[in-house]
Amino acid sequence: MTNKLLDALAQAETVAITGHVNPDGDCVGSCMGMYLYLKENYPGIRADVYLKDVRESFSYIEDLDKARERFELGDKYDLLLLFDVSSRDRICVSQEILHSCARSVCVDHHVTNPGLGEENVIVPEASSTCEVLFGLLEEEKISKAAAEALYTGIAHDTGMFHHSCTSGKTMRIAGTLMEKGIDFTRIADVSFYTKTYRQNQIMGRTILESIMLLDGKCIVGVVSQRVMEFYGVTPKDLDGIVDQLRVTRGVEVAIFLYAVGTQEYKVSMRSNGGVDVSAVAQSFGGGGHVRAAGCTM
């Protein structure tokens, strides 16, 4: 069976790796998992990771401090690896990176991904991009450090193995990564459950000021630029709010909007199963999954 990722790597000497804006655990985990795998198994390849606005809670991932936040025009690579990116406008750091690489491979699990790379490995039924990536790598060559990154992505996109996207295959892969000796308890505590006081404050305020619509079937929370400035937070501090809104009894859809610019809002949507929020997001130029999607308005 053809492995598009490994086939492309066999012909590359320089590789750029990137994910999506406001990178979550799956994005960070897949990008860094790939970087660490290359570092450990492809000494002849020079690889650079491009990620911006990464949450401090992921700092335990090895070499994350080497990620670049800016793409310099003029930089050239043999291969671009795109992870967890469903559309061109969601590419982290700069879209110019698309034009600076001779080839590109996109690895993703978003059903709305049109095929962003020249070669694509898109598996919508997978729990996460990290699950897809695991299937493309040689298991025995995955180190403990790379396993930590991959486990992080799977754990986050499954909501610590709670969401319906979790399958038996997902659990078997997670078990394999655990057997590499990773501290899975620490990963959960540090990157998923632990919140700063300010994060708890703004989550509490958002829930307090949220409104119920459609006879309680839809809940909406909003964070304005003014409120973000008041609490001294940035978009990366808002992780988890939409999921907390979703678990409200009787709610079928949760919508969370937060300011990202003047008269511009990022919209995150979650469904408890009866509504395909990816279809809603697509109508506004966004995308995602049936139960988790987003767009910018």
Write out the residue ranges for each language-model feature.
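Active-site cofactor/cluster-binding pocket
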Residues: 62-64, 68-119
